[in-house]
């Protein structure tokens, strides 16, 4: 009888342990079930580009009409003078001619373009400044100086005109094999293309850069600014990236590494204060 009692006790303990395990399992399942029904966190919405202010773009385009017309005339005048100087030089030469004898130095050539266009480019920059500031013109002019504007525009003139033009003239020299008459013919063709086509293509980019530069210069450092894409401009992934960046402190750069437009050929974007 004692043996039977001990066996009964053993089974009783096992049944008790089994019941406790089942209860524990049920509790675990309930806890797990409870956790899965928690309200999921809301997904973070991707940033959206700021709404374009069409009036700001229209004001810019209107302000640059007269500037562009004068820039075209002055740039073509410089190109014509360069061409004539080269052709006159070549007419007096019978022997082979090298590039350095035909073209002025890079620095002198760039300086000629800078001096010819600085008046109109400063005017464009002032228009940009006045689009964001109501200060007196005399006060704005302290910020919109030849140095602050032309240090940026000089590089633009070099990249858009001087470098590519010199490259074309280099090819003229190489293709002519030193023949002055052949070189003259190729140079005429090159300058004709620049005066008839290229100048009109690039002048808008140059004046819009001056306008944006002027607007940027009157903003106080640290002011929150946004990159605004012109819906009438060409599609550009870089511009979209800058726009999606949202607010940036003035003085800091947008994702593309630029402080303000223009960042590519045909760029029509603007940088504007967030609290405009």
Predicted regions and their residues:
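N-terminal leader/targeting and assembly helices and adjacent pre-domain segments
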Residues: 2-200, 204-214, 274-276
């Amino acid at each position: 009888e004692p043996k039977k009692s001990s066996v009964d006790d053993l089974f009783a303990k096992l049944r008790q342990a089994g019941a406790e395990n089942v209860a524990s399992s049920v509790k675990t399942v309930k806890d797990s079930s409870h956790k899965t029904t928690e309200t999921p966190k809301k997904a973070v919405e991707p940033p959206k580009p700021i709404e374009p202010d069409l009036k700001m773009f229209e004001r810019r385009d209107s302000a640059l009409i007269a500037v562009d017309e004068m820039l075209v005339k002055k740039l073509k005048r410089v190109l014509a003078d360069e061409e004539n100087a080269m052709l006159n030089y070549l007419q007096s030469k019978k022997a082979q001619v090298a590039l350095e004898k035909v073209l002025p130095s890079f620095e002198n050539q760039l300086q000629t373009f800078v001096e010819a266009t600085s008046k109109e480019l400063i005017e464009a920059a002032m228009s940009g400044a006045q689009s964001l500031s109501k200060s007196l013109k005399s006060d704005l002019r302290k910020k919109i100086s030849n140095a602050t504007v032309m240090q940026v525009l000089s590089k633009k003139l070099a990249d858009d005109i001087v470098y590519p033009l010199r490259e074309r003239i280099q090819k003229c020299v190489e293709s002519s094999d030193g023949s002055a008459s052949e070189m003259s013919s190729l140079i005429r063709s090159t300058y004709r293309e620049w005066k008839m086509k290229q100048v009109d293509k690039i002048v808008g980019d140059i004046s819009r850069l001056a306008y944006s530069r002027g607007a940027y210069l009157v903003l106080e450092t640290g002011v929150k600014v946004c990159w605004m894409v012109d819906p009438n401009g060409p599609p550009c992934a870089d511009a979209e990236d800058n726009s999606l960046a949202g607010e940036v402190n003035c003085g800091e750069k947008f994702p593309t590494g630029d402080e303000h437009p223009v960042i590519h050929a045909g760029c029509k974007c603007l940088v504007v204060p967030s609290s405009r």
